[in-house]
Amino acid sequence: MLKKDDVTPDFNELNLAQLSVEFDNIVGDRTLAINNSANLYTNAAREKFSISSLQYFISNLEITTTAGKVYVVNQDSSYFLISGADKATRFAKVRVPEGDYSKLKFTLGVDSLRSTMPLDKREGVLDPAYGGGHDLSGMYWGWNSGYIFFKFEGNADVISNDVNGDPTGKHQFKYHIGGFGGYSAPTLNNIKTVTMDLNPGGIAKVRTGRQSNIHVLVDLMKAFNGTNNFSIAAHPTVMFSDFSTKVAANLTEMFKHDHTEN
């Protein structure tokens, strides 16, 4: 906790301290629970559903001081894969200059530059083989040579058992949203930028020897109930299609700064 007489330090890009951004996944007014078949969620279309998997990329963090100075986190240290099944992954921890910060900006997804870099520049969670491939826990389309930015799966009884739903009879929905604009030819671009004003919930006071934590709520219900409302029954599977742009537009509405712990 900061002292009452805390003085804002001079901005010095060589004087770095730790900043944490916490992505707290919720579903409406409830905490996210994976495999919640005993206590289903209900969306605006009154469809009951459970969630079996959630993963998304956060990258390219950028923060702005109360005086207007912008600091871009070193890109090599600015890629995070948040997993709903692993609470330890909810923190994006970076090092930034000591100071008072009133704005946070980040990318939901993986930028086109990194997406097209040689494999030795895409390690860890960016390794295309990470997670065992697209059909398992992987976040990379081998057939499309691109990252899945947002992977959201679950089950809902409203999904039909035919080709318009889930022919396997498992009533499964899959939303795999990606697309960085294309390498050699233009394609879908679902990269999204989120900017947050930290003033209402409290600015981040980053100091050496302490950890400031920006607490962000991520409401998954907005994936269905955002600007582009849709039903699970009508769109049980969305991947690399035109409709993915509507889902992607909803995703930016999931993020809301709740408070900051200094």
Features from the language model and the residues they span:
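A short, solvent-exposed, low-complexity linear motif enriched for acidic/polar residues
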Residues: 4-262
